[in-house]
Amino acid sequence: QPVIQKDTFGNRTELSYELDGKIKDVRRSGNHQRILQQYEYNARRQITGVVDGNQNPISYDVDSWGRITGIGFADGVKEGYEYTPAGQVSRTIDGNGNAVQYRYNSLGKISERIDQLGFTETFRYDEEGNLSLHIDRDGRQLQRACNVFGQPVYEKASDAEGKHTNISTWHYDSLGRVTRAVCDGKSYEYIYDAYGNLKEKRSNGKRLVSYTHDRAGQITEIRDPAGVCTRYEYDILGRRSRIFNDDGLEVRYGYDALNRIRHIRYGNGVETAYTYDGDGNIRTLETRAGENVLISFAYRYDGNGNRTAKAGTQAALGGITSEITTGNNALDLSYAYDVRGQLLEERRNGTSVCYAYDKAGNRIRKTDAQGETRYLYNEKNQLVEEESPADRKQFSYDRQGGIIEEKNAAGIRLFSYNSRRQQTRVETETGNVQENRYDAEGLRFELLENGRRTSFVYHDGELLQEEGREEQGTSYHLGAGMEAFRRGQELSYYHRDEQLSTVFVTDGQGEIRNSYQYDAFGIPLETTEQLNNRIRYTGQQYDELTEQYYLRARYYNPVAGRFMQEDVYQGDGLNLYAYCGNNPVVYDDPSGYKRKACPPQGKISERVDESGSKPIGATYEGTIYRSVDSRYDPLEMSQYTINSNHRYTESGVPGLYFSSGEKIVKAELGNYDVFDFSNRTMYSYDVRLTNMLDVSNPSVRSQLGISLESIVGEGYDVTHAIGRYAYSNGYNGIIAPSARADGGINIILFNAKGVK
């Protein structure tokens, strides 16, 4: 019997099942019915294939344990996976046949990673299982000491000769909250209120950021180092409804019945309106300044949710004036993709840019109006040569995977890194020099461009204030995105497209001051500025001197369409340089670690802050029982549950389960006939909640088109679909209602390490 789910707008999702309860297919019906996914199984009822929404088959080879040993795509590309007897991944083979090997210690922790060229990086651990030493492939060493709770208190990074040391230290209070962090001479102190919310962040004794919260823990005010504040109001459902201050800032939000932003109204009279299709994709986007239409677009998508068309108008500016030019402002874009979801063609007003990729996802060819550009790679998927009609570039890398040299027709561009493998210096072929410094939060707090210093202050990883580039500092106002900035007495507003990229900046009277257009990978096509502005493509910082985007963990080169450093995360595809899996139309990667849907769909929390997550300082009491002879810290276990099969997790979707208190966890274990707890130890943690999919919230269930009964019943097909959705879209975990204890809440963390 099919299970039919219906959302507030009448969109239906139909799930069909095999006789044994395995999900057969998922169909969506609105104006017409279509199949979103179909599933295939072998005689052991292990999944062997999926047919996607575009009817492209994906095949899975599985061993007798149900572990995936191969993934095959419709274009003949195949990836391979091998395992240890204990079930850990021991070898991955990309589409070009190049392999990375992994070795583990007796506790199942990774001890060595051997790359495609045979270079090894080493990992060592203390008696509690915490990482104590990491030696990378260039010989750089990171030594770490942790407290009894597994929190880092000391780190020393040095080069292969033990020189160029970089030391970080952390201090915590009795509740495990960080109170002081120091790195590279930059010291942060953190002060909390009586309810555990972050009240103030200081640096070397000077106040940087202060916060005010309401009784529900929601941020009601943020004040930056210059004293500029942003205030927040929320509606009865806890959704951000307004940001404002006493200096004229005003942004109001309206939502539809599924909690999606319906409109944004700015204090200067500009308004942006959204409509959505049955899958939650943006159908139309329009931004108006009075009678003037700045942006008006309609969008179409394929069966996998890839955007295939964007048609409408975007206002053009006459020179650097604020007058909108008359005439044809039409902008008609279309996109085509291969069976792996990689962008093959971007057509802009009839002019095409085409891309081709090898079996490992490396761009090997780009064809545009200027001609053909070809790219060559080594076994590690590193770009080593780029040849275009105008230039020939050659690239060199260190053993750890960071670019160190680019030779081109104009000269040589050099890149340098510190002992933590963070990019610290770029010297361009024209003699310009950019230097970067980083704090204990891993963020760039200082930038020097040819000796000219700019300092940055962040809130939750988002830029809040900068000083040095202008005669007067710049204060940023954060809301659903980067909403506005104040420089001196002048207030300006940001206006974004469907990718969250800045397309216009308007002043306090609604006049256009800046205008931007980009290609799909973020290359600036048209830039008209009266005001200096670094917030550009996908809302991220653009460094004009080096022509890179700063994406926190790494730097992104839009011309090459790839990162310039190897990803330290190993879970976002086997190609560690590809930007967003070569699909920048649908995804972005603000962290530099992992792509996510842009804009994210279904990211709703009962109490949201500027990042769409739980407020700073909010915690969850997570309780878990483990056998007293268990060798593992429970918070370590999530990374080893890749093949577990539980309510929200399955093969390929790891997760660790907590319950909201002892009573709930005992009820959960009782389902497995566990009633004697004398040989078990109870662990209780204050787990910070950030970027969680909260299906305990009825409004979120409505948005996703699921019922409470479908996720607390006996079958796991709906919950497994939720788990796959949350994991693949970059959520940190799931908040879910307990299936065994009324009123109980469970939390599932995809990677629980470091959540305390």
Write out the residue ranges for each language-model feature.
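Beta-strand elements of repeat-based all-beta scaffolds
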Residues: 1-7, 11-52, 56-73, 77-94, ...
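Structural motif
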Residues: 116, 137, 545-548, 559, ...
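A motif-centric feature for acidic-aromatic and gly/ser/thr-rich catalytic loops and repeats
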Residues: 373-379, 384-385, 471, 488-552, ...
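Short, low-complexity export/processing leader segments characterized by acidic and small residues
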Residues: 505, 523-525, 554-562, 574-603
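Short linker/helix segments within small regulatory modules
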Residues: 569-573
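Active-site and NAD+-binding cores of ADP-ribose-processing enzymes
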Residues: 600-651, 671-756
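A short, exposed loop/beta-hairpin motif centered on an aromatic-Gly-Thr core
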Residues: 650-659
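A short, charged, amphipathic alpha-helix used as a generic interaction element across diverse proteins
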Residues: 660-672
